[in-house]
Curated annotation (Swiss-Prot):
Similarity comment: family membership: Belongs to the HisA/HisF family.
Main location: cytoplasm
Swiss-Prot/TrEMBL catalytic activity: 1-(5-phospho-beta-D-ribosyl)-5-[(5-phospho-beta-D-ribosylamino)methylideneamino]imidazole-4-carboxamide = 5-[(5-phospho-1-deoxy-D-ribulos-1-ylimino)methylamino]-1-(5-phospho-beta-D-ribosyl)imidazole-4-carboxamide
Any one GO CC term of the record: cytoplasm
Annotated catalytic residues: 10 (proton acceptor), 129 (proton donor)
EC number assigned by the record: 5.3.1.16
Disulfide bond found in the keyword field: no
Single GO BP term: L-tryptophan biosynthetic process
Protein name: 1-(5-phosphoribosyl)-5-[(5-phosphoribosylamino)methylideneamino] imidazole-4-carboxamide isomerase
High-level lineage: Bacteria, Bacillati, Actinomycetota, Actinomycetes, Mycobacteriales
Keyword Chaperone: no
Organism listed in the record: Rhodococcus jostii (strain RHA1)
The entry's keywords: Amino-acid biosynthesis, Cytoplasm, Histidine biosynthesis, Isomerase
Pathway membership, UniProt: Amino-acid biosynthesis; L-histidine biosynthesis; L-histidine from 5-phospho-alpha-D-ribose 1-diphosphate: step 4/9
Gene: hisA
């Protein structure tokens, strides 16, 4: 089985951007989300990972624009950012996306999250945004600004709730081009039977090959963002390197 690559389109104020370590104000603009997403589709992506950063930070949303983008794409979309109640979840699913990624809601409102998982099953992935604090993996909430508790306790709870998939981000790596946290990915895979999508830190084709080496342990895919936008490699090159 080959590693699924999900090129990322992060959206702020109607524009595709990349942040460094998720910090507001560190964004670099890359034009229209529609053009970015269509470019990844044309380059061979099977999935595109689209994040509404305004919604994630709680400062507005790009919902209508993103619904239009999802509608134009022929490939599957994983939609993320600010999905934390029935209205935002139903609006996200109504775009026709393949699945949504819940983040903050899984930490702040576990009962609602459990209901969403029970109702929508495979349509729900949970984003585990992790930072190493005093030797322990802690979760980060709302746009990575708030504390979210212990990773392993939350993972055990979500497994019990029947979560179908986890998107694991080492926040300290995201947008830095410093390489993925393979140890964290392996530990999460060991702790759950659900498939894991890796996110954060990918800078080279070799990084993707290293993540692909964890497919047998449970890693299903990898989100790739800044490395593609910065021209470190092309999506066709990356797809060729990790195809089973």
């Amino acid at each position: 089985m080959s590693l699924v690559l999900l090129p990322a389109v992060d959206v702020v104020n109607g524009e595709a951007v990349r942040l460094v370590q998720g910090e507001a104000g560190s964004e670099t603009g890359y034009g229209s989300p529609r053009d970015a997403a269509l470019a990844w589709q044309n380059d061979g992506a099977e999935w595109v990972h689209i994040v509404d950063l305004d919604a994630a930070f709680g400062r507005g949303s790009n919902r209508e624009l993103l619904a239009d983008v999802v509608g134009e794409l022929d490939v599957q979309v994983e939609l993320s950012g600010g999905i934390r109640d029935d209205a935002s979840l139903e609006a996200a699913l109504a775009t026709g996306c393949g699945r949504v990624n819940l983040g903050t809601a899984a930490i702040e409102n576990p009962e609602w999250c459990a209901r969403a998982i029970a109702k929508y099953g495979e349509k729900i992935a949970v984003g585990l945004d992790v930072r190493l604090v005093d030797g322990e993996y802690q979760l980060r909430g709302r746009g990575w600004v708030t504390e979210g508790g212990n990773l392993w306790e939350t993972l055990a709870r979500l497994d019990k709730d029947g979560c179908s998939r986890y998107v694991v981000t080492d926040v300290s790596k995201d947008g830095t081009l410093t390489g993925p946290n393979l140890e964290l990915l392996a530990q999460v895979c060991a702790a759950t039977d659900a498939p894991v999508v890796a996110s954060g830190g990918v800078s080279t084709i070799d990084d993707l090959r290293a993540i692909a080496g964890l497919v047998d342990q449970g890693v299903e895919g990898s989100i790739v963002g800044k490395a593609l936008y910065a021209g470190r490699f092309t999506l066709p090159e990356a797809l060729a390197a990790v195809s089973g």
